[in-house]
Amino acid sequence: MDTEEIKEEMQEAAEAAIENAVETAELETAAIKAEGAAAAAEQSAEQAAVMAATLAASVEANAAQQIAEHSEQVQTQEEKISWLENQVMAMASNLQMMQEAVTALTVSQSLTPEPSPVPAVEVEAMPEAVTVEILPESAGDQQEAEPVPSVGDQQETAPRKRFRAI
């Protein structure tokens, strides 16, 4: 083999080695890029997991707060309902006592005889004196007695008033 052929073969071998080196470099670059993409994907997945966990915790906390507020409102409503029930029970008890009193009064009135009418009584009213007339049982035997003032000697100044006893 002559030098030319050896040179050519060496050149071809060098070109093949260069091509292999380029291919190897490209493969290594692709591998590095793939590793980078995998690392980025892993990091993104981790970030997504952290965000999902944060979101889940936030949703859970919000739900717990809403449940607590709702429970508080329910308890307040139950207390109001209980208070209203107590008021209704007290009113029902009072109504029952009133009905019993009305029934007792009605029965009492139905058992009580009607009162007889009372005759009108004439009463003299004087501002500072009261006059009392004492009449004997048989007024025909004696003369009419003079009124005797019981307080002071004042004359009658007020008009007579009539009262009916009930």
Swiss-Prot record:
Localisation per UniProt entry: Virion
Keywords on record: Viral genome packaging, Viral release from host cell, Virion
BP terms from Gene Ontology: viral DNA genome packaging
GO CC terms in record: virion component
Highest taxon of source: Viruses
Record keyword ATP-binding present: no
Principal cellular location given in the protein's record: virion
Location of the region described as Disordered in the Swiss-Prot/TrEMBL record: 134-166
Subunit structure: Heterodimer of P6 and P9; further multimerizes as hexamers of heterodimers. Part of the dodecameric portal complex that is composed of the packaging efficiency factor P6, the DNA packaging ATPase P9, and the internal heterododecamer P20/P22 which spans the virion inner membrane.
Annotated function: Together with the packaging ATPase P9, forms the external part of the portal vertex that is embeded in the capsid and which plays critical roles in genome packaging and genome ejection. Both proteins multimerize as a single ring-shaped heterdodecamer arranged around a central channel.
Protein name: Packaging efficiency factor P6
Naturally occurring in which organism (per UniProt): Enterobacteria phage PRD1
Gene that encodes it: VI
